[in-house]
Swiss-Prot record:
Similarity comment: family membership: Belongs to the LeuD family. LeuD type 1 subfamily.
Gene Ontology terms: biological process: L-leucine biosynthetic process
Keywords: Amino-acid biosynthesis, Branched-chain amino acid biosynthesis, Leucine biosynthesis, Lyase
Lineage: Bacteria, Pseudomonadati, Pseudomonadota, Gammaproteobacteria, Oceanospirillales
Quaternary organization: Heterodimer of LeuC and LeuD.
Name of the protein described by the UniProt record: 3-isopropylmalate dehydratase small subunit
Gene name for this UniProt entry: leuD
Length: 215
């Protein structure tokens, strides 16, 4: 998992509440268990005018010109500004995979679905919650100012706007530690590899009958 310390990125405002995981990455693209390759089909039903299917050449598909991520001013966006209850629906881990693969590092919204919230942090995304009034103001600024960028400092837990306004956000200390160190569940386990091996050796010595092969 990539480390997250500080990120400055272009903001894409997605003005839609209750965006569910099926809208983030439709079910027909869930056959793969790899973490990469989902970016081209992120928000597939909103980005394209035709129906998508696995293996399709997305370069030949007609784009929806009204969708925010297809508009030239938001190309290269890495901060997604969203509305309440983002990530609701089924608990597919492919949703944060698709967002990360597309290039997003930060998502800001008034609220997130619990399971999506947990999955996103475990896959290197920083999710930030602000109250509705603050999010409304960020939407207004991002839509009014082309090239609107936010500076996100995880260590200080601050978001700085182009005008210099500093917004402070809360983050669970353990999740913050994992992002700063780039540790997912596997990485956390491997940090204790020596202790695990030591336990296994002592366990085998103390209870050898558990390890005898039948025959």
């Amino acid at each position: 998992m990539r480390q997250f310390d500080r990120h400055q990125g272009l903001v894409a405002p997605m003005d839609r509440a209750n965006v569910d995981t099926d809208l983030i990455i439709p079910k027909q693209f869930l056959k793969s268990i790899k973490r990469t390759g989902f970016g081209p089909n992120l928000f597939d039903e909103l980005r394209y005018l035709d129906e998508g299917y696995p293996g399709q050449d997305v370069a030949k598909r007609p784009l929806n010109p009204d969708f925010v991520l297809n508009q030239p001013r938001y190309q290269g966006a890495s901060v997604l500004l969203a509305r309440r209850n983002f990530g609701c629906g089924s608990s597919r881990e492919h949703a944060p995979w698709a967002l990360e693969d597309f290039g997003f590092r930060v998502i800001i919204a008034p609220s997130f679905a619990d399971i999506f919230f947990n999955n996103a942090f475990k896959n290197g995304l920083l999710l930030i919650t602000f109250d509705e009034a603050t999010v409304d103001r960020l939407f207004q600024e991002a839509e009014a100012e082309e090239g609107y960028r936010l500076d996100v400092d995880l260590e200080k837990q601050q978001v700085t706007t182009p005008s210099g306004e500093v917004l402070t956000f809360e983050v669970d200390p353990f999740r913050k530690h994992c992002l700063l160190e780039g540790l997912d569940d596997i990485g956390l386990t491997l940090k204790d590899a020596d202790a695990i091996e030591d336990f296994e050796a002592r366990h085998r010595q103390a209870r050898p009958w558990l390890f005898r092969q039948a025959g």
